[in-house]
Amino acid sequence: MFSLPRVFTLSLVFVACASQLNIRQSTNTNAAINSILDTLDESIHHISPTILTLMANQTLSASTLGPQMTTLENAFTQADNDLAATAVSAGSTTVAPTNDDISITYSDIMQLVSTTLSGIIPSGDVPGFPTMVQTFDPIMAKTTLQLNITSPASLVLVHKMMADARQFFAAEGFTQTLSALGF
């Protein structure tokens, strides 16, 4: 039925075809992902106090908030681009930074953004804030989804940690971001 040369030839063909397949998650790129998120987290920790100071000093307006929102948008866009350029991570639950470390950092970022922006609508000082949200929301949602691609299942813990803070995103109109987070 099958001669030895045919079996050998078929085996070589199968090996050649199989060697072309790339393993989807071959390396742990958590360190690169964590570095990207640390940069984003640092940016958010600079932008948030500025926005909160504008509110506290009663100098919040479209002209003072606009540049801060642009800075937020740029920070998330850069993180999205950097995450997209990073190989999908095999991840790790034991080697630092772990999958949970990444999720905790991103959750911190999201909680800080949601709580920082939560006082803008009630203040009434920026009537154009919903328009700013319409611009920023898809950017933040895209970064969130890209994180979940580059670090698979990373949003599971973020979703749980955002259980309370999601109310602020809902009140501010961040529907795409909430959807990306699984709400």
Regions from the PLM with identified roles:
Residues Q20-F183:
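A taxonomically broad motif for mature regions of secreted/extracellular
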